[in-house]
Amino acid sequence: MSGCCCSRKCPSLPAISLCSTEVSCGGPVCLPSSCRSQTWQLVTCEDSCGSSGCGSQCCQPSCSVSSCCQPVCCEATICEPSCSVSSCAQPVCCEATICEPSCSMGSCCQPVCCEATICEPSCSVSTCAQPVCCEATMCQPSCSVSSCQPVCCETSSCQPVLCLPATCQPVICKPCCCQPVICEPSCCSAVCAVPASCQPMICEPVVCEPACCQPVCPTPSCCPSVCSAASSCQPVGCETSPCEPPCSEASACQPSACMALVCEPVCLRPVCCVQGPCEPPCVSSSCQDSSCCVSSICQPVCPEPSPCLPSVCVPTPCQPSCYIVKRCRSVSCEPISCPSPSCQPACCRPGSSASAICQPACPPRTFYIPSSCKPPCSPVSCRPICRPICSGPITFRQPYVTSITYRPACYRSCYSILRRPTCLASYSYRPVCSRQPCTDSDNDKCDSKKPTSSQPDCADSTPVKTEVSDETPCQPSEIKPASPITREAAAPQPAASKPADR
């Protein structure tokens, strides 16, 4: 008897004889070429099929494009297919015959994985491999409200399911919940190419139905930053999504969910700021300019909701561009009133100190007291501003520039630049001694004005409590402004000028 049950010539496998010449209805039959492993499946025919040659109406599977595709799992054995995750292969198109699983057009076509049975595949959710697209209209998507996982999503690819709808009918191949947890795709663009006139089926669970298919990503790539210069970046029309702040229709604010530390502000709401005259625009890529860096503890202060320029919000007491805001509540930080944006002298550069006071980094020829936040507007007028360390009891410790090169020529010698006295009152600085140091021509005049008592030469100075010694802090001494004075060298000099009858 010739083998009439084979629909085509099957390839031969090692040590397995395929498509024997002596074939009956109970013998092995070749599957179509869509099966990945090209193995066999036992076809149990009825008695009417008999020994008359195995008619093609019951034993020979035929494919139809319009029929429902049921995946069939096969293994490289004869007549006993068993299902496993690795061997769950491509779908096989079959008609509603006796020996093959049939698909009803009115029911939802789910992926089917075979167990170790004969000709009766059963579905197992754990071994579901490939999703199947079916043209069903009365089916509800098999989506769990709690997990919101796609129907058949592999953790390796994390790509949307490819859909091939032929006509304008609703398909359910897309995941019903567009919030995958284990996958991290890019901004969700539906791969299912449905014609414009087709309306896909709406998911039944209302809990997870963002219409724009916006996944909940730990690091979303579609959230524009406030520091971004692109003004056309509008948020996607999502109703409820943890990835984006609520959008206000009254303003054209750019929302952001950036959680940066230094170079980007922490924005939990749409930020609209008016770019001030002394604030340069931010650079979104590297943020090299230190004036656009705002500490994460500073809360953005937005004066007006328009014109919504992409500017960086800085706190009210620390707003000049030539200072780095390190702490929002600084007691001696005053804003700079610059007449024009170009009024940025060379002696006022953004500092990098971690002090609580806005402290500029000035050239050696210029010295700034941190409380004086008004630098000159031209490099030639950078005259040293001499202020005493302690003009009276002050309650806080002044963070002075500790470098000896920043010491001005008119700075008083009785206060070492390396000493940081602790003061005991709280009012503003007031100048005490602003005279220039004695020159060579004025040595006689300076010698005649040397005090003979232990009182300081400044009349309005008050005693201060220093950290080094208990001696009188305002004993005049002869100094050289250009030479550095250390803690050891400056300490013995006041003791040498003490009166003998003390």
Curated annotation (Swiss-Prot):
Annotated spans, 15 X 5 AA repeats of C-C-X(3): 73-307
Q: Name one Pfam family in it.
A: Keratin_B2_2
- What family classification does the UniProt entry report for this protein? Belongs to the KRTAP type 16 family.
Name where the sequence repeats lie. 4-8, 58-62, 73-77, 93-97, 108-112, 113-117, 133-137, 152-156, 177-181, 187-191, 212-216, 222-226, 272-276, 292-296, 347-351
Its keywords, alphabetically, are: Keratin, Repeat
Feature: compositional bias, Low complexity: 489-502
Lineage start: Eukaryota, Metazoa, Chordata, Craniata, Vertebrata
Annotated region (Disordered) at 435-502
Q: Does the keyword NAD apply?
A: no
Q: Which InterPro entries does the annotation name?
A: KAP
How does the record describe its quaternary structure? Interacts with hair keratins.
- Superkingdom per UniProt: Eukaryota
This protein's gene is called Krtap16-1
Cellular component, GO, one term: keratin filament
State the name under which the record lists this protein. Answer: Keratin-associated protein 16-1
Q: What does this protein do?
A: In the hair cortex, hair keratin intermediate filaments are embedded in an interfilamentous matrix, consisting of hair keratin-associated proteins (KRTAP), which are essential for the formation of a rigid and resistant hair shaft through their extensive disulfide bond cross-linking with abundant cysteine residues of hair keratins. The matrix proteins include the high-sulfur and high-glycine-tyrosine keratins.
